[in-house]
Amino acid sequence: MTTAEPSKTVQAAFRDTAIFDLIAQEAERQRVGLELIASENFCSAEVRAAQGSVLTNKYAEGYPGKRWYGGCEVVDEVERLAIERVKQLFGAEWANVQPHSGSSANLAVYNALLEPGDTVLGMDLAHGGHLTHGSPVNFSGLRYRVVGYKVNPETELIDMEEVRRLAHEHQPKMIIAGASAYSRIIDFAAFREIADEVGALLFADIAHIAGLIAAGLHPNALPHAHVVASTTHKTLRGPRGGVILSNDPEIGAKIDRAVFPGYQGGPLEHVIAAKAVAFGEALQPEFKDYAAQIIRNAQALAGAFQNRGYRVVSGGTDNHLFVLDLRPQGLNGTKATRRLDANDITISKSTLPYDTEKILHGGGIRIGTPAITTRGMKEADMERVADLIDRALKGEDVKAEVHAFAGSFPLP
């Protein structure tokens, strides 16, 4: 990887060459590599400029108009703008843009609406769920009694009848609809129907699909869920952070208190400004074109792997990601990741439904198209991407080809 020229430029501009040399190296890594981690993306120069602005200097504990510190007139307007834009984006009546991450947003939801020991029904991690949906090593699994629902062993789709059966059997206080490695449409209306049957709250975690929902390409969770949380990066293409939405003002008030003073102090107003920029970008007509291309690319790439004899979990994808089962190839997620990393192709290993492989390794890999779509790749390019990954998984050295191919697509 060539880093000499960026390094010289950086050294001339900054005194702390140790850090800025590393930043230059990371910029070059991103430029010449293929980024296929489903939860990563490339945000715009305007998003990065807002996040790197003087707003980082301002402490602003509290909420707009109700701050602990003085001098918050400007950041109040920044935060109000972020709130109004995200409400417009998702059709929400209330929003909190202060959570530092998606996990922080989920923590606030739980703290606001649950008591320790309450029963929660969420998607099993091995079947596509998320750590914060009740994993025993996460706060969500340690603090609450969690019951996991799974996908159907034959279709590998969420088994809504099992969700209903478990809900009636365990009477959860909350049902979580959302995933981190599930490639199909989530039926939020069906989840709400089940939640109403047992008197449960419905919490939708849309972190992965938020950009697709914003573009109208996946059903919106908000008309059905009592509360919705998301990250602001991934398919939304903003800075790393979290956001919480609801149409219930009482729930909103509880969550506001859970965020501040519950577990956060000063919000990161420079990040909130970057969120506002990203929300504004997602409100533009061209964002729908971008989101549609993400899905087309994911479907084309999944098809290219199927044509090469790979098994795609659930047989395809309706969103931005899919999971490859690598057990027939004699690989697991850890081995595959190492081979791809050696060729500057980045993916994430993934567990598989009903897999016996240790969860640390996973039986497959999760592949996502948001980042390569941001760089301008189209369906025709997915054949080349699949070819490079296929050959790298078989042990070939394709790094030079990856650099030449990826480097021909600009970063924002």
Curated annotation (Swiss-Prot):
Protein's UniProt keywords contain Transferase = yes
Q: Which domain of life is it from?
A: Bacteria
Pathway named in the protein's UniProt entry? One-carbon metabolism; tetrahydrofolate interconversion; Amino-acid biosynthesis; glycine biosynthesis; glycine from L-serine: step 1/1
- Please give the cofactor(s) recorded in the UniProt entry for this protein: pyridoxal 5'-phosphate
Named from the GO MF annotations, one term is: pyridoxal phosphate binding
Modification N6-(pyridoxal phosphate)lysine, positions: 234
Q: Name one GO biological process term.
A: glycine biosynthetic process from serine
Q: Which family does it belong to?
A: Belongs to the SHMT family.
The job of this chain, per UniProt, is described as: Catalyzes the reversible interconversion of serine and glycine with tetrahydrofolate (THF) serving as the one-carbon carrier. This reaction serves as the major source of one-carbon groups required for the biosynthesis of purines, thymidylate, methionine, and other important biomolecules. Also exhibits THF-independent aldolase activity toward beta-hydroxyamino acids, producing glycine and aldehydes, via a retro-aldol mechanism.
Which protein, by its recorded name, is this? Serine hydroxymethyltransferase
Organism whose genome encodes this protein: Deinococcus geothermalis (strain DSM 11300 / CIP 105573 / AG-3a)
Q: What is the lineage of its organism?
A: Bacteria, Thermotogati, Deinococcota, Deinococci, Deinococcales
- What is the primary gene name for this protein? glyA
